[in-house]
């Protein structure tokens, strides 16, 4: 890599000496990725061991919970919004898409490596787990008794978990029933719902305002 100049040289100067760096033609990078879209840089790494929910949520005040969100593009967009709008952590059910899937990581603009995240344990009630950690849970769902996102009752809560559901079906009815609050986003022109990634950005922004 001694012949590398320009911006690439600046990037390489930040790499620790024990990280091997290789250069290749664009055709080679395309073959490695399996598709033509590449930003000119690839990285291979070992997956870190995931922390427990309790470890991830230490000192957290506003977190997101993703129940069976399946689309990697949505996962990436949600992580990007979570980072930009001040969410402290993201928790996922095991049935959802992997945040480290390459499309999810790319759409997140790398924020899957910035926002703390982990999977919720299977076989136990994760709403109860979050309650034990001091969180009040907020289901984003369309119901007649849903609160507005700026409801003062939410403002009074020191620790909130915003719960978002899978594409299409949304949250399971049992999940909604187990949450402390149900909230909805007011919409116009007869539109009854938003894509989960778009809805997450609206909800995270409001929680950031509540968080001060």
Task: Specify the residue positions occupied by each region the protein language model found.
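Internal active-site segments that recognize and position negatively charged phosphoryl groups
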Residues: 60-99
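N-terminal positively charged helical leader segments and presequences
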Residues: 1-36, 136
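Structured adenosyl-cofactor binding patch, chiefly the S-adenosyl-L-methionine
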Residues: 41-43, 81-85, 96-112, 173-212
